[in-house]
């Protein structure tokens, strides 16, 4: 009924995950287990469980409702497992990695929903080896028209722009359903939680977020499904995107992002769905289907980019198809664009671009291709 966590587990581990860093008393504290309980909050600052300096903590078969934060990890932890939990309808964050040192954490087989400040949030700290798999993660943002920067999964070091000690890398987000809220079944003119995302990576200029895999997820119904700023070496593969409002994917100020083998489809809705890259280098978008993007912006937009490969993409029933602006050293090959909206262009490459190589593409509608933007090649 009061502020703070219902359960606070405080250990003494100050080392890493290496056995050489353990003190004898740490082994006596190892693997604290919280299992088979329900926690209900009755205070605005009531939390569920806090983990501090633990080694091998396991939270399993636990329900947390009506609290502020569900599971709050603080200061330093190692080898944490959160599994088979229900973190539901909390005013804060479901699983909160709060500016801590944490390597090795698994979050799996859990329902994390309706937590209004984010589902799984990693903010600052030094975090490595985060695995999120087999979860249903939904509507972890405001439930009304309040603007937000949170996400169902938020990984954010942008709040410490001058501090290189705070960094996040080595993340796997696999096999989850991640969705809501934007406007799944509401009126077209209303957007719930504008600015929200399913997955948001927010890095910083002095230290990008890096080495992230996003694979095998079902993603839908947020302002931007995946939003990436200042990251490198990110693999986005074999995901199903639908019902965005307005964007499926936005990537800015990033390098070596690979987007491959995905399906992009609004399903029964009319949605824009744009895939947008700005100020990015050496990325690949390939082997994906892009269907019925109802937008004048362009289905796939590159703005101020360099060194891209677009290959094996199928666009059907979209507004404008591929749009390039101030982009250079880019190859577009084996792409097929058909049934583009009347008056829209399959591809637009104006004279702000340079050294663009086209090879083996099939365009069935209008095209705008300035010869001065093209690379010198016999295939042009």
Residues covered by each model-derived region:
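Short glycine/acidic-rich loop motifs that flank beta-strands on beta-rich extracellular proteins
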Residues: 2-6, 43-49, 68-74, 91-97, ...
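Leucine-rich solenoid repeat scaffolds
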Residues: 333-380
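Consensus "Asn ladder" position of solenoid repeat domains
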Residues: 37, 62, 85, 90, ...
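Extracellular beta-strand-rich solenoid/capping regions of secreted or surface-exposed proteins
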Residues: 1-33, 40-56, 73, 157-162, ...
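Right-handed parallel beta-helix
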Residues: 23-115, 144
